[in-house]
Amino acid sequence: MPSTVEEESEMPAVQAIDIVVNAFTPREVQNGQTGFDVNFMRQVRMPEDMHGGVSIEDYLRRMDAAGVERSLLIAVRAGERNWKGSFEIPYDQIAAYCDQYPDRFSGLAGVDPTRGVEQLKDLDYAVNELGFVGAHFYPHWYRMPPDAPLCYPIYARCVELDIPIMMQVGQNLIYQKEVRLPSVAKPILLDQVAIDFPDLK
């Protein structure tokens, strides 16, 4: 609790939860785990001082300033492993951030429909062992619409694990100048998914 009236006035009245946050620390930048290039950073007007990454401590300061109580960090899986421009952030890497600040961060397990049973086991591990609270899917990175058959086992496992899955739908951006991804995740395609999985969150 704030100790003074001045401090209290600086705290937003309503605390929020940021449901999709990409880890963008110097570690992810140095390891090529961001998925975008300098052209994208300029396109979205990212301040120059952020191009090298933002420390976890700075994340927390920004969360406090914006009135964000908790953020959901994505252990991203973006594209098949052998595709140019693809990248991923290991589940354990995101779990370490969550363990460091358990009252501020929770993990989301990125999913790759092309990995089959391996992905289902990975999702079990993320939820049951690491304490992740949901799954996350980037359809455009796989050039795969959300109603594709390869996605269905993942949706079924999410229902079994009683976790939500979130995904990026709609118009896609140009993240990398040399890798153009199609806008395959049209929102209407979730209609059939919702019909087939009425209990999917």
Segments (PLM) and residue ranges:
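Mid-domain alpha/beta scaffold segments of enzyme catalytic cores
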Residues: 4-150, 157
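Catalytic pocket-lining loop regions of alpha/beta-barrel enzymes
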Residues: 130-134, 144-201
